[in-house]
Amino acid sequence: METTMFKGSITALITPMNDDGSLDFSGFGRFVDWQVTEGSSGVVPVGTTGESPTLTHEEHARIVEYTVQVVAGRIPVIAGAGSNSTAEAVGMARHAKSVGADGVLVVAPYYNKPTQEGLYRHFMTVADATDLPLIIYNIPGRSVVDISVETMARMAQHARIVGVKDATANLLRPLQVRRAIRHKPFTQLSGEDGTVVSFLAAGGEGCISVTSNIAPRLCAELHRAWQDGRVADAMAIQDRLSAVHDALFCESNPGPVKYAASLLGLAGETCRLPLAPLAEDSRMRVREALTGAGLLN
């Protein structure tokens, strides 16, 4: 699949669970199909929002395979393949390739705090393992390490490293990356719903979104408006969803978005420990944001 397909509103999928914490595959299938029909430009299973840290390896693999089956080629599936073990990330990427995913999203290794050279070698090794396009996921708030612009430019020399999901919340970064990587197209996707229009203005091409779990049609329309040059329309949608973006991070992701999904009848709110149920004041904030945006009566 052409890497130019990795643009627009791409949903970082929640993983629906039953009350006992087991996976709700039937609910997940309906949810993924709804994402496609509502206009999402792509989906990312088993990322941060999909609770990858608390999934078993077998569950991770099943979710990726099932997502590919449900999507059935209608939009790109970018499989989460991140780990703080390079060998484990390679295994996830190879599995994603074997079941028909269109690309992989690989997070910067967390907890073990590699140097920039270690980061470079990690991503190059994963990129060498398959012929899938690889999107770097830079989220220093969770991984502690920040992939520098210089390191990213080195990585971009690899033909299969095609872009980045930037969750630094630093709006200088897309400008810096665009200047540093000029030898080929390099897709920059925002990892921050709240600043998405500003990110697009700085050269971004899309967003791997949490909010699109519950408002996929609006998120997709924002990106279509931007791509069509209807800046005022894109800003109007951003303004409408602004309080929702904020509320969905009032506690650790994906707790708030799963609660929002439960209010809308899309999925249950259950997360696996150590993520706890939302506090009552957080629940109120999410409800008020959804109501204010016209998503909940």
Swiss-Prot record:
Pathway: Amino-acid biosynthesis; L-lysine biosynthesis via DAP pathway; (S)-tetrahydrodipicolinate from L-aspartate: step 3/4. SUPFAM superfamilies: Aldolase. Coiled coil: none annotated. The active site is at residues 137, 165. One of its GO terms (biological process) is lysine biosynthetic process via diaminopimelate. Disulfide bonds: none annotated. The record marks 48, 111 as: Part of a proton relay during catalysis. Belongs to the DapA family. The keyword Transmembrane helix does not apply. InterPro entries: Aldolase_TIM, DapA, DapA-like, Schiff_base-form_aldolases_AS, Schiff_base-form_aldolases_CS. It catalyses: L-aspartate 4-semialdehyde + pyruvate = (2S,4S)-4-hydroxy-2,3,4,5-tetrahydrodipicolinate + H2O + H(+). It comes from Gluconacetobacter diazotrophicus (strain ATCC 49037 / DSM 5601 / CCUG 37298 / CIP 103539 / LMG 7603 / PAl5). Gene3D superfamilies: Aldolase class I. The lineage of its organism: Bacteria, Pseudomonadati, Pseudomonadota, Alphaproteobacteria, Acetobacterales. This is 4-hydroxy-tetrahydrodipicolinate synthase. Pfam families: DHDPS. It is found in: Cytoplasm. GO terms for cellular component: cytosol. Pyruvate binds at residues 49, 208. Homotetramer; dimer of dimers. Catalyzes the condensation of (S)-aspartate-beta-semialdehyde [(S)-ASA] and pyruvate to 4-hydroxy-tetrahydrodipicolinate (HTPA). It is an enzyme of class 4 (lyase).
